Structures are given as structure tokens and as C-alpha cells.
Regions:
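Active-site loop of short-chain dehydrogenase/reductase
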Residues: 13, 62-63, 90-91, 136-150, ...
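Conserved glycine-rich Rossmann-like NAD(P)H-binding loop of the short-chain dehydrogenase/reductase
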Residues: 37-51
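Substrate-binding pocket helix/loop in short-chain dehydrogenase/reductase
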Residues: 105-106, 110-118, 199
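Catalytic loop of short-chain dehydrogenase/reductase
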Residues: 145-167, 172-181, 193-194
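A glycine/serine/threonine-rich, flexible loop-to-helix segment
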Residues: 181, 192-206
């Protein structure tokens, strides 16, 4: 395995990856650790987080921490970010990767299903970014990367996710302008369709 990035690019940096127990988050955490970062994994399932942390330690010999957290829960997010800062003192970056959705035409999405996807893909990312900023980055600076989706022309079959990701794109632009004076960069990345474990729940052929 050889990265396209410079060796030790993130040496001495502490980076949080939400949704770090599987899929894109897991791969992102491995890449960041391989480039020298100390990664902090967040997710809802402790067994998955522990497995990825163990993989990273074995592959890189570097420290990997993990915390269970439902990013849709404001109090839990606040407390988890506080616990992270207590352990690592400074957070240099946040990858807002956690998300989830289910395939459905717009007409068949219930209010509960709609609100669940919005809370996961928009509200959760906002809460994480806000708390990381307010609890440390407003003083130390840093970088926030929000993982979105290729929703620019609409997302047929995924209207709830497209709406949430479009909201996250606008939030990204607003936060970038408001937090630039604190030395915080905020960007969004739309990786497109990735054949990760997240697609295991989708119907065949989608």
C-alpha cells in the first residue's frame, strides 16, 4: 500500500472521524493514521470501533482512540467532545463522515423516515462541528471536512439524503465564512458512489 500523500503529513495531529467503525469512515481513519495522525473514532457500535482501532494499532503502531456516540443526541455530542478534549487536549481536525439513509421514492418516505435521515446527515454533522469549534478550535484553529454526496442534480430514490446533504453543503459554506477568523477551515467533499459496506442494505442493482 502506498499513499499519494507525503509521509507523516499529519504527524503530531489529532483527528476525529465520525462513522469510523465501517465504510468510508474506516478507510479514512486508516489513511490518516498511515500518514501519522492520532485518530479518534466515533460511532454508535463499540465492537466495530474497537475492531478498527485495533487494526490501526496493528498496521501503523500508532495510537487510536474510540468513543461511542450518537451524533443526533445534542447532550451526548457535547459530553463526548468534552471527553475527547480532556484526553487529547487539542483536536486539529474533524471528518464529519457519519451518515445513513435508505432507498425510497419521495412519495413513499414517512415523516419519521425523513426526519431520521435529516438528523443523521445534517443535524449530527452540525452538532459535531459546533462542539469541536466551541470547545477548542475557536482558540487553536483547525480543519473540518464534511462528507456529503453528489446531489447537485437531485437524488432520485434518495430525496431525504439529497436534501440533508444540500443543507450540509450550505452549512459548510456558512461555517467557513464565520469561522475563518479563528483559523478554522471548513470544506465539503462529495465522494460519489463508493462500494462500501454502507451499500449492503441497498437492493441489488441499485
Amino acid at each position: 500500500y502506498r499513499s499519494v500523500f507525503r509521509d507523516d503529513l499529519f504527524a503530531g495531529k489529532t483527528l476525529i472521524v465520525t462513522g469510523g467503525g465501517s465504510g468510508i469512515g474506516r478507510c479514512t481513519a486508516h489513511e490518516l493514521a498511515a500518514l501519522g495522525a492520532r485518530v479518534v473514532l466515533l460511532g454508535r457500535k463499540e465492537d466495530k470501533l474497537k475492531a478498527v482501532a485495533d487494526e490501526i494499532r496493528e498496521d501503523t503502531g500508532r495510537e487510536a482512540l474510540f468513543f461511542t456516540c450518537d451524533i443526533r443526541d445534542e447532550d451526548k455530542v457535547r459530553d463526548t467532545v468534552a471527553a475527547i478534549y480532556k484526553q487529547v487536549q487539542q483536536v486539529d481536525g474533524l471528518v464529519n463522515n457519519a451518515g445513513g439513509q435508505f432507498p425510497s421514492p419521495v412519495a413513499m418516505i414517512s415523516q419519521k423516515g425523513w426526519e431520521t435521515v435529516i438528523r443523521t446527515n445534517l443535524t449530527g454533522g452540525f452538532l459535531m462541528a459546533r462542539e469541536v469549534f466551541m470547545q477548542g478550535m475557536n482558540k487553536s484553529g483547525g480543519s473540518i471536512v464534511n462528507i456529503v454526496a453528489d446531489m447537485w442534480g437531485g437524488m432520485p430514490g434518495m430525496g431525504h439524503s439529497g436534501a440533508a446533504r444540500a443543507g450540509m453543503d450550505n452549512f459548510t459554506k456558512t461555517a467557513a465564512l464565520e469561522w475563518a477568523c479563528a483559523g478554522v477551515r471548513v470544506n465539503a467533499v462529495a465522494p460519489g458512489w463508493i462500494a462500501s459496506s454502507g451499500m449492503d442494505t441497498y437492493p441489488e442493482g441499485m
